[in-house]
Amino acid sequence: MREIIQEVLPSFNSNKPFALATVTRTWSSAPRPVGAAMAVLESGEVIGSVSGGCVEGAIHEASLEVLKTKTSQSVTYGVSDDNAFAVGLTCGGTIELYIQYVDQSSFPDFADIAAKIEDKKAVAVATLVSAESGIGARIVLTKSDASGSLGNTQLDHAAIEGARALLNHGTTKTLKLGPNGENRMDDV
């Protein structure tokens, strides 16, 4: 998101919604790393890239659906998907993304995050992208404070601890935590 946040900020500040697609997981030779982001504005304009062009068309369509329904979703494209070649994932590998609906009411911290990034301050966003319920819940954190919740205190504590470790190392990663914050190999 860091790469595109200043370009989408005018839309946010004008309360014009957009869909924000973020790479949450990759396998094999996916073209972009976890954390790569692409925004699709209401006009259909695309800002950023999540796959180096491999599946942008399919993600654009999914993003327009998110804008229409105002419902965030996770999507996966890969070599095991019969439609992978059809959507352009000819480079191999698998890519999983979380596409979220963003406007001033759904993501009120967005402008503050943009300001911190502009000021070169460390900031992280932990978003619940896979769970029985609560998809889209988030915690915004810096090295010294955090706001928001993923749904319960134990999960919040584990997410903050994990995200701070990543923040301190300047890296991005998908944390796999259970509903009570336990580390897991599978999804929540």
Model-derived features: positions:
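Segments forming oxygen-rich coordination pockets for charged ligands
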Residues: M1-V188
